[in-house]
Regions:
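Short glycine-enriched loop/turn motifs at secondary-structure junctions
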Residues: 4-5, 63-68, 98
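A short linear hydrophobic-aromatic micro-motif
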Residues: 33-35, 57, 91-94
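Vicinal oxygen chelate
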Residues: 1-4, 88-121
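Core segments of cupin and vicinal oxygen chelate
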Residues: 11-54
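Short acidic/glycine-enriched loop/turn segments that link adjacent beta-strands
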Residues: 40-44, 65, 98-102
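Mid-chain, well-packed structural core segment of small domains
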Residues: 67-85
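N-terminal beta-strand motif that seeds the catalytic metal site of vicinal oxygen chelate
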Residues: 1-22, 69-71
Length: 121
């Protein structure tokens, strides 16, 4: 037996907020939405995937945002994305550079923490 890699990241969201998730993850972050399997659609939530990047947002009736645990997402042209996020009213917190990477944190519209990373050239 061998675990090879992470298949996807699951984040929780409140019920009935799929359009808000589509706006943030789809429009702002540019991750395309993919259809959920028919047998899972009744649960609510929405999935976004781009190649090996898979973020699944699932409805949690007792939703509480993940404020410390977070996925780290590699971004191309992070400075441009930071500008867009700030224009849209999101608070972006810059962190110390580590491993020659520019790193910031932002909360999605539900309060889930995301780390956005771009390797410095």
């Amino acid at each position: 037996m061998q675990i090879k890699r992470i298949d996807h990241v699951q984040l929780a969201m409140p019920a009935g907020r799929e359009d808000v998730a589509r706006d943030f993850y789809g429009r702002l972050l540019g991750i395309p939405e993919v259809p959920k399997p028919p047998e899972m659609q009744r649960r609510g939530g929405v999935w976004f995937e781009n190649g090996d990047l898979k973020i699944h947002l699932g409805v949690d009736p007792d939703f509480k945002p993940a404020r410390k645990a977070h996925p780290g997402l590699l971004v191309q042209d992070l400075r441009a994305l930071v500008g867009i996020l700030r224009q849209e009213g999101f608070e972006v917190l810059e962190d110390a550079q580590a491993n020659d990477c520019y790193r910031v944190y932002v909360a999605d519209p539900f309060g889930n923490r995301l780390e956005l990373i771009e390797p410095e050239r």
